[in-house]
């Protein structure tokens, strides 16, 4: 079965694959972030959003994976075999979970549309030859301010007219006073 965990959120494994593996924070940092920002919602018996549900599931999967790793570490006698298992878990499964955790935490923090815009912007940036692209990659936290990709159905932001300068009222008064004195 080929299951894409991002499909229902409008993204895909392919879209996230444009981000390099060292882009994603460590599992520990992601778990700390999720706990600091969303602990109450994650521990709540009530349904908050599909992102909260996916985040709960990813956290539970990571916990079970750590239980398995602990069991393997305690039951595998051969240090070389143990190292192979730990390495496989960290490289393959760890990366997938880091991607999933990052995606859902980012969607909850910045909004799904902003994260999708970021993934598209980064994908375009990374595939553009170095000579033709800006030196710095797009940054998620600044994307809403200078996004090239516009949301559908949203009109571009209009500029606010600059405030008119107020003229001093005193010259008018003087004129009217001087005219009044002439008459």
UniProtKB/Swiss-Prot annotation:
InterPro entries: Hepatitis_core, Viral_capsid_core_dom_sf_HBV. Phosphorylated by host SRPK1, SRPK2, and maybe protein kinase C or GAPDH. Phosphorylation is critical for pregenomic RNA packaging. Protein kinase C phosphorylation is stimulated by HBx protein and may play a role in transport of the viral genome to the nucleus at the late step during the viral replication cycle. Sequence repeats lie at residues 155-161, 162-169, 170-177. One of its GO terms (biological process) is microtubule-dependent intracellular transport of viral material towards nucleus. Residues 177-183 are annotated as: RNA binding. GO terms for cellular component: host cell; host cell cytoplasm; T=4 icosahedral viral capsid. Keywords: Capsid protein, Cytoplasmic inwards viral transport, DNA-binding, Host cytoplasm, Host-virus interaction, Microtubular inwards viral transport, Phosphoprotein, Repeat, RNA-binding, T=4 icosahedral capsid protein, Viral penetration into host nucleus, Virion, Virus entry into host cell. It comes from the Viruses. It holds the Pfam family Hepatitis_core. Homodimerizes, then multimerizes. Interacts with cytosol exposed regions of viral L glycoprotein present in the reticulum-to-Golgi compartment. Interacts with human FLNB. Phosphorylated form interacts with host importin alpha; this interaction depends on the exposure of the NLS, which itself depends upon genome maturation and/or phosphorylation of the capsid protein. Interacts with host NUP153. This is Capsid protein. It comes from Hepatitis B virus genotype B2 subtype adw (isolate China/patient4/1996) (HBV-B).
